[in-house]
């Protein structure tokens, strides 16, 4: 193929027209070898003189890109054209390109396409190579080209035997001299010359099967096989769909413009606008317009002959471009083109062949669906063979046409060279004409000059002539000589004039003749110029059109390149995702295809096995019947055995009853075990269901376990503390018991002392002298009693103080209880918040899926647990309150008893002092316990901190539920703070953890039911919120009260400070005398006062801050509620906005995906298919090799089938052996019966063993019962311990009742303390004021001290003066020291008073510290709330950012949509521009479908061979079975025959002994017996004939042709059906013309009339055309072997 052919676009006309005018006489169009008319209709010429394509469709391989790899290897040698042929009109432009020849010849150039070098990466530009191993040159270009796909090498040859100068189709790839450039594949280049390499003389030479050269005319065939599967009438097609019209001229594509009834013929018709002007009308028939189109583009066809084009069908993305889609298209095209081959092959047999009898339909019972499928497959195989022949004929015709095209191109080149010569001649003629014209002008100018001279001379002559007579008259005598001279001169002049005139006339005549000749020449040249100009104009127009088309093509290419670049830019962005999707889909497609292939293979194998098994079943049924009888016998035996077993079962049932009696004791335990087992089974089922959930939950459970372990540690610590407290309580109780015992002993002693007193009284009466002593002793006793009463009063005061302390403790506990209640309320509020958030989470969980539901379920479970824990804490608090009340009551009762006993005796005072010390110890122990509790609370807080860390880490992993988990953490913190007094064991936690996994499954179900309950609970929670607000107000009121109490305390402090200040003023007067010692004490007091003032100020600040924080908390709670409402609203709005945006995004993504899919499809079709089909060709070659291998394997299988016949015979022997084996099996069955009897015995033994095992199990159960009893005993012990603990609890409750009494007293004392606190607060305020005054006084004192220091200096100066006065001073100093000692004693007393004040201050400090703790907790809560606010603000900021991002994304999406719309518009323009290219791509698809069809043919042939093998095997089996049956029948008949012969002989022998009367009867018996014998002989003869026929069938099957690939391979099996006849659907006539050739359709040719039936009857015979030329070397029709060129072209 020449490189001037443009293969890229496929726009160059493959059928150029010859030039109409030929100036050379020899170069006429008649000499051009045209195609011999066989079945090709005459093409209709267009306006430009270009022949239109024939109605017969070119083979689908013309436009294929599959042959691109063999581009440039045609079979013919044609001259290289310098310029391309003129293009066709846009309306009639064909889609075939100039690479058709290479695509057709690719099937015949296997020698030229041999791979010489596999490593193509070694070649470099400038490297010296040998083309084909023979022609040397240098590489000048390596890369992709526009004329063909793939990588090509441009080589500059050493010799001018190339094809071009580096330019192909107007595109320059490199530059070299003409005829030295050539393009070749890299695989055809070598780096060294090949020794035996020669150019093949006939590159297309290859072996091909012989076939007939007679060709029959084509015709339209009306057959059901032409109907494609896609046709469904109006349901399958719609107006505007792209369709294919199948007819005798091939399949023609077009667009469906009309579908419905017409007036020119009944029925539904399809009006199609064809792509090429090969139709009949312009949409109008009989002056009725059905649709509009160009003339010769419209045609009306029945619906049966129209099928949807594959391009119009909406195929799935995963199937487009796949092999299945290509094969389906190929089968559609192949079915559409089978009718012509059948007509062509069977037209010659129409006369000679007798009509085949129609095949009678057999019943459905005789033939299965497999037989029908086999018949259909055979029919399809015939159609495929005919199609192959038709395709080969079409390819040969195309080769001939291509050869004609090449010759026309050579003719065009010659005509172009002639044009150049003519142009040169015209230029020379124009030069000569210009010269002639110039010479003529000069001659005309000279002739005019001469004429003027002649005219002047004539005028002079006339003047002379007129003057001569006067001269003669005047001077005749004087001038005779002059006259003669003048006359001579005149004569001479006249002669000269005549000569000149003659010369001028001759010249004028010559000039006139020359002018006429030149005019004639000019006319002739003008005519030639006009003709040449017309020719040049036509050629220039054609060249302009061609150049414009080339320019347009180049522009289109440029635009294509630009669009490709844009598409590549867009595609590269989407290609990654698309390739990924394609990869996934391709994997799925491959998987599905593999599954389909496996299913097909399995179905085929199952069908073959089913056929074999049906045959085997027929054989085995007889054996089964025999075995059924044996089984019946065995069943009878088994029945007997079963009866025996039933007897044994009765025995075993008796044993079972015994076992049941034994098991009744264990049934309850077994029921419990069964319940537990059922629960375990259910849990296992739930675990099986939640395995996937557990994988995720295991991590969470592990975290929870860690938390649980930490909680265990904390709880163990708390339990240890509680145990210690309990131990301390028990020790206290023991001490109280001891004290009670001591009191009882004391009472006993009192009673004894009273007895002694009575005795003493008796003695006093006897002894009067002892009265005085007794009076004195009584006085002493009275004094002691007074002292004891004083001590008793002191004790009562101490008791009151203790009561006050108890009241303070009770108040503290009440405060703690209130705090716990507030915390519980807060926890409930937090629970409400969590529930609200849970509802939000549920809404989110509907979107988030299982994880959200799991988290919600977890949180719900945790909340339920926390609720239960909170309820437990409340119950425990209530129990503690009741215990405290009971203990207070007990204390009150004890106090009453103590008071009564204190009145009776004074000895109790000492014990009371001891009790005071013990109470102090208990208080110390309690304080230590409080310290321990505080340390443990700190440990709990540390554990909570660790829990917070863990929860934070968990929150990082769970970003979606971070807020909830933080809140849950807060709740857990508060609840862990509340759980300081709880009693919880590790077993409960483990049970909770075990329940947790169960509740996770049930939580999902409960969520739906609880969602309704939550809505009701929300209303309750709102009420509870109102109650909480009231509680907050109450707490505020309590805070105001506390403030008032603080003020009172301050006042009391101020009063005490006033007193102190007064004392200080007194001390100052005394301290003026003292210099140094008093100042230190004052400084200490001042520092203490400053510390107390600072602490008071700090406490006031804390109180104010607490108030502010409470107010801020209120505002924060309200703000958080509002923010939560706003956030929920914004979340709802955002969710709706997000849903809308997601919907829009999904729509835009869908649009983008569609656009990207279209762009990808276009780009991939333009880019990938060109390369992909090349690879497919390689794969086809590989597959062909594989198929050849398979054919060889199938031949071997056929040989194996022949061997299988021998194996069948051997199997017959083996079947006999099987019979013996069956007999042996019968014996084995009998043996097995014996074995079963033995088994029955073994079963009996096993039953016995099982009974022993059951007994062993019973023993085990007894042991387990013992263990259970031990456990029950342990449980009883635990119950006893619990009872004891309950008793202890009761005791504690009683003590609590006593304590409650004490609490009441303490509460009363607490009221007094509150009053005192109010007073103290007032004192504190007064003290603050006094402190300010004291500070001013201290400043003054400091000033006085300075003055005193100055005085001391002065006194030191005056020491020398005062030495004399030192003695007096020493005396004064001694006096002062005495006074100082007194002052020290007073100071000690004051210090004691100060210590008491410090104790009170310490108590107030403890109260303040508790308040500080509560304030700290409030601060922590505030900080947490602030953190929540921050998180909410961050979330709101994040949401705002997300909104802004979404807005930006929306704007970007809108911009991208606008860009995409612009791109879509450009794409539409691009689609309009690519319409013709898509046609070429469609032809490429058709070619690929052809290749796939070839593969299908090979697969079908393989399947045919396999079916043939199966048929042969089936036939062999059936023949073998029939022979078996026949042999059996023959044996039975022979037995009957022998029996009848014996009976006849016996009758003959008996006839001889009978009398003559019975001769007639005997003759009748003989006749009947002879008739029977004849009948039996006839039956035997029929059976033998059938046997012979079956043997003949077997022999024919054995002698089948081994090569089923030949076209006549199946002629031995079935006869060819007669070819279908021509039929016109409009005229409703046979054998006249096709529907598409009906003259009624033609809108222009209305002169046609419907042919009559007589003409049909008379003109049934059709003449055959003359045989076509055929090339043996090329194996192609269209040229003879002698005309074939031998050189190889590229």
From Swiss-Prot:
Positions of modified residues (Phosphothreonine): 327, 362, 1681
Keyword presence, Repeat: yes
- Name positions with the PTM Phosphoserine: 64, 67, 216, 309, 322, 325, 328, 1682
Recorded GO molecular functions are: actin binding; microtubule binding; microtubule plus-end binding; myosin VI heavy chain binding
Query: Which keywords appear in this protein's UniProt record, sorted alphabetically?
Result: Actin-binding, Coiled coil, Cytoplasm, Cytoskeleton, Golgi apparatus, Microtubule, Phosphoprotein, Repeat
Q: What happens when the gene is disrupted?
A: RNAi-mediated knockdown has no effect on nuclear positioning in fat body cells.
An example GO biological process term is: cellularization
What is the stated purpose of this protein?
A: Together CLIP-190 and jar may coordinate the interaction between the actin and microtubule cytoskeleton. May link endocytic vesicles to microtubules. May play a role in formation of furrows during cellularization.
Under which name does UniProt file this protein?
Answer: Restin homolog
**Taxonomic source organism:** Drosophila melanogaster (Fruit fly)
């Amino acid at each position: 193929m020449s490189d001037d052919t443009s293969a890229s676009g496929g726009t160059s006309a493959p059928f150029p027209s010859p030039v109409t005018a030929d100036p050379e006489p020899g170069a006429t169009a008649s000499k051009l070898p045209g195609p011999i008319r066989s079945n090709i209709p005459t093409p209709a010429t267009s306006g430009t003189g270009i022949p239109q394509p024939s109605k017969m469709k070119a083979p689908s391989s013309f436009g294929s890109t599959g042959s691109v790899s063999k581009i440039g290897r045609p079979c013919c040698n044609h001259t290289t054209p310098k310029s391309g042929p003129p293009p066709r009109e846009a309306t009639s432009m064909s889609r075939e390109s100039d690479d058709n020849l290479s695509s057709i010849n690719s099937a015949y150039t296997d020698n030229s396409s041999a791979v010489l070098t596999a490593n193509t990466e070694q070649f470099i530009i400038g490297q010296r190579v040998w083309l084909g191993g023979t022609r040397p040159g240098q590489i000048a270009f390596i890369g992709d080209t526009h004329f063909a796909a793939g990588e090509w090498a441009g080589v500059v040859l050493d010799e001018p035997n190339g094809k071009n100068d580096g330019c192909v189709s107007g595109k320059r790839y490199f530059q070299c001299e003409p005829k030295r450039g050539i393009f070749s594949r890299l695989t055809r280049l070598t780096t060294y010359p090949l020794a035996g390499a020669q150019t093949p003389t006939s590159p297309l030479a290859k072996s091909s099967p012989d076939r007939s050269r007679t060709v029959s005319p084509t015709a339209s065939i009306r057959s059901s096989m032409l109907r494609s599967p896609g046709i469904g009438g109006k349901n399958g097609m719609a107006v505007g769909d792209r369709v294919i019209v199948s007819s005798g001229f091939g399949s023609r594509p077009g667009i469906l413009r009309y579908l419905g009834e017409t007036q020119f013929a009944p029925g539904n018709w399809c009006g199609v606008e064809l792509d090429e002007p090969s139709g009949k009308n312009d949409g109008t028939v009989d002056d009725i317009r059905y649709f509009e189109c160009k003339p010769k583009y419209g045609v009306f066809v029945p619906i049966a002959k129209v099928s949807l084009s594959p391009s119009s069908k909406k195929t799935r993305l995963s199937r487009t471009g796949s092999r299945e889609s290509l094969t389906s298209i190929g089968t559609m095209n192949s079915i559409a083109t089978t009718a012509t081959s059948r007509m062509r092959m069977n037209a010659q047999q129409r006369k000679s062949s007798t009509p085949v009898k129609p095949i009678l339909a057999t019943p459905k019972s005789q033939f299965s669906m497999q037989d029908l499928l086999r018949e259909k497959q055979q029919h399809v195989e015939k159609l495929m063979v005919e199609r192959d022949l038709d395709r080969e004929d079409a390819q040969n015709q195309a080769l001939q046409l291509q050869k004609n095209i090449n010759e026309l191109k050579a003719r065009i080149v010659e005509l172009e060279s002639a044009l150049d010569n003519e142009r040169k001649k015209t230029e020379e003629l124009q030069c000569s004409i210009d010269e002639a014209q110039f010479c003529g002008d000069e001659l005309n100018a000279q002739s005019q000059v001469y004429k003027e001279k002649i005219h002047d001379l004539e005028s002079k002559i006339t003047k002379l002539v007129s003057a001569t007579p006067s001269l003669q008259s005047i001077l005749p005598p004087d001038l005779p000589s002059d006259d003669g001279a003048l006359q001579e001169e005149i004569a001479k002049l006249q002669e000269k004039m005549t000569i000149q005139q003659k010369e001028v006339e001759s010249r004028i005549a010559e000039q006139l003749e020359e002018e006429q000749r030149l005019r004639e020449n000019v006319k002739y040249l003008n005519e030639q110029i006009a003709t040449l100009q017309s020719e040049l104009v036509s050629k220039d127009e054609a060249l302009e059109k061609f150049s414009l088309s080339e320019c347009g093509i180049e522009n289109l290419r440029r635009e294509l390149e630009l669009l490709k670049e844009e598409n590549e830019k867009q595609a590269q962005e989407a290609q990654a995702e698309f390739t990924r999707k394609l990869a996934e889909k391709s994997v799925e497609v491959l998987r599905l295809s593999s599954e389909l292939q496996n299913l097909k293979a399995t179905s085929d194998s199952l069908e073959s096995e089913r056929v074999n098994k049906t045959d085997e079943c027929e054989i085995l049924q007889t054996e089964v019947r025999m075995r059924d009888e044996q089984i019946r016998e065995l069943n009878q035996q088994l029945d007997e055995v079963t009866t025996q077993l039933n007897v044994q079962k009765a025995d075993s049932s008796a044993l079972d009853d015994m076992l049941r009696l034994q098991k009744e004791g264990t049934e309850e335990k077994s029921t419990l075990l069964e319940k537990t087992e059922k629960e375990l089974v259910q849990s296992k089922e739930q675990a099986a269901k939640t395995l996937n959930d557990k994988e995720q939950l295991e991590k969470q459970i592990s975290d929870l376990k860690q938390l649980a372990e930490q909680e265990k540690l904390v709880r163990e610590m708390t339990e240890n503390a509680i145990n210690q407290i309990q131990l301390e309580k028990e020790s206290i109780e023991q001490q109280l018991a001891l004290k009670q015992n001591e009191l009882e002993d004391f009472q006993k002693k009192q009673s004894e002392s009273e007895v002694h007193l009575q005795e003493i009284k008796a003695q006093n009466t006897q002894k009067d002298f002892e009265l005085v002593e007794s009076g004195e002793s009584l006085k002493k006793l009275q004094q002691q009693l007074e002292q004891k009463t004083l001590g008793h009063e002191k004790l009562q005061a101490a008791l009151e103080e203790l009561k006050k302390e108890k009241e303070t403790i009770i108040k503290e506990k009440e405060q703690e209880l209130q705090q716990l209640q507030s915390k519980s309320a807060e926890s409930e509020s937090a629970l409400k918040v969590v529930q609200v958030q849970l509802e939000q989470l549920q809404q989110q969980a509907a979107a988030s899926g299982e994880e959200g539901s799991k988290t919600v379920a977890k949180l719900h479970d945790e909340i339920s647990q926390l609720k239960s824990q909170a309820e437990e804490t409340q119950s425990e608090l209530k129990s503690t309150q009741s215990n405290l009340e009971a203990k207070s009551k007990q204390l009150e009762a004890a106090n009453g008893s103590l008071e009564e006993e204190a009145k009776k005796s004074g000895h109790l005072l000492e014990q009371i002092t001891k009790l005071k010390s013990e109470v102090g110890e208990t208080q110390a122990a309690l304080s230590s316990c409080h310290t321990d509790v505080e340390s443990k609370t700190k440990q709990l807080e540390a554990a909570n901190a660790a829990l917070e860390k863990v929860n934070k880490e968990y929150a990082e992993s769970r970003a979606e539920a971070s807020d909830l988990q933080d809140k849950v953490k807060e709740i857990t913190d508060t609840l862990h703070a509340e759980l300081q007094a709880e009693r919880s064991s590790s077993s409960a936690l483990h049970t909770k953890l075990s329940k947790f996994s169960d509740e996770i499954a049930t939580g999902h179900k409960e969520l739906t039911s609880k969602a309704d309950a939550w809505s009701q609970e929300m209303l309750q929670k709102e009420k509870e919120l109102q109650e909480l607000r009231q509680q907050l107000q109450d707490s505020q009121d309590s805070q105001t009260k506390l403030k008032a109490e603080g003020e009172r305390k301050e006042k009391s402090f101020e009063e005490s400070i006033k007193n102190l200040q007064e004392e200080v003023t007194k001390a100052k007067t005394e301290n003026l005398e003292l210099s140094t010692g008093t100042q230190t004490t004052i400084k200490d007091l001042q520092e203490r006062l400053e510390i107390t003032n600072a602490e008071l100020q700090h406490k006031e600040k804390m109180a104010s801050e607490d108030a502010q924080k409470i107010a801020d908390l209120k505002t924060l709670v309200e703000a958080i509620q509002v923010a939560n409402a706003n956030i929920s609203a914004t979340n709802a709005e955002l969710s709706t906005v997000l849903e809308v945006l997601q919907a829009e995004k999904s729509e835009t993504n869908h649009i983008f995906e569609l656009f990207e899919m279209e762009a990808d499809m276009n780009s991939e079709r333009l880019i990938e298919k060109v390369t992909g089909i090349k690879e497919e060709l390689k794969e086809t070659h590989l597959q062909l090799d594989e198929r050849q291998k398979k054919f060889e394997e199938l031949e071997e299988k056929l040989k194996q089938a022949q061997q299988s016949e021998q194996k069948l015979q051997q199997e017959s022997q083996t079947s006999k052996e099987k019979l013996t084996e069956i007999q042996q099996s019968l014996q084995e069955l009998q043996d097995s019966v014996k074995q079963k009897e033995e088994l029955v015995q073994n079963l009996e033994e096993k039953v016995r063993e099982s009974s022993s095992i059951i007994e062993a199990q019973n023993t085990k159960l007894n042991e387990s019962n013992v263990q259970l009893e031990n456990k029950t005993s342990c449980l009883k012990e635990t119950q006893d311990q619990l009872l004891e603990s309950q008793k202890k609890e009761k005791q504690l409750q009683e003590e609590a009742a006593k304590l409650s009494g004490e609490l009441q007293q303490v509460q009363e004392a607490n009221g007094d303390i509150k009053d005192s606190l109010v007073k103290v607060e007032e004192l504190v305020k007064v003290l603050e004021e006094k402190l300010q005054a004291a500070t001013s006084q201290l400043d003054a004192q400091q000033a006085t001290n300075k003055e005193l220091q100055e005085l001391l200096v002065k006194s030191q100066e005056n020491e020398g003066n005062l030495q004399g006065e030192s003695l007096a001073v020493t005396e004064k100093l001694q006096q002062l020291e005495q006074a100082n000692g007194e002052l020290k004693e007073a100071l000690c007393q004051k210090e004691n008073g100060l210590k008491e004040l410090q104790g009170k201050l310490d108590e107030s400090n403890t109260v303040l510290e508790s308040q500080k703790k509560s304030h700290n907790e409030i601060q922590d809560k505030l900080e947490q709330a602030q953190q929540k606010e921050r998180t909410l603000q961050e979330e709101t900021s994040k949401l705002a950012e997300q909104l802004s991002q979404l807005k930006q994304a929306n704007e970007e999406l809108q911009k991208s949509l606008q860009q995409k719309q612009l791109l879509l518009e450009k794409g539409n323009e691009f689609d309009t521009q690519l319409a013709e290219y898509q046609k070429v791509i469609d032809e490429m698809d058709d070619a690929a479908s052809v290749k796939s069809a070839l593969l299908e043919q090979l697969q079908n042939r393989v399947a045919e061979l396999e079916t043939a093998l199966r048929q042969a095997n089936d036939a062999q089996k059936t023949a073998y079975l029939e022979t078996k049956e026949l042999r059996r029948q023959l044996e039975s008949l022979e037995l009957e025959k022998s029996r009848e012969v014996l009976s006849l002989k016996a009758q003959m022998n008996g006839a001889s002994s009978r009398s003559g009367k019975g001769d007639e009867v005997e003759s009748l018996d003989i006749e009947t017996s002879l008739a029977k014998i004849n009948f039996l002989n006839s039956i035997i003869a029929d059976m033998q004939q059938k046997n012979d026929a079956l043997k003949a069938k077997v022999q024919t099957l054995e002698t089948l042709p081994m090569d089923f690939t030949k076209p006549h391979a199946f002629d031995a099996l079935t006869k060819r059906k007669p070819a279908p006849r021509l039929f016109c659907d409009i005229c409703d006539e046979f054998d006249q013309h096709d529907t598409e050739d009906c003259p009624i359709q033609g809108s222009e040719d209305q002169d046609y009339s419907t042919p009559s039936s007589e003409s049909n009857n008379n003109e049934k015979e059709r003449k055959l055309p003359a045989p076509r030329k055929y090339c043996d070397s090329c194996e192609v029709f269209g040229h003879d072997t002698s005309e074939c060129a031998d050189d190889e072209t590229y």
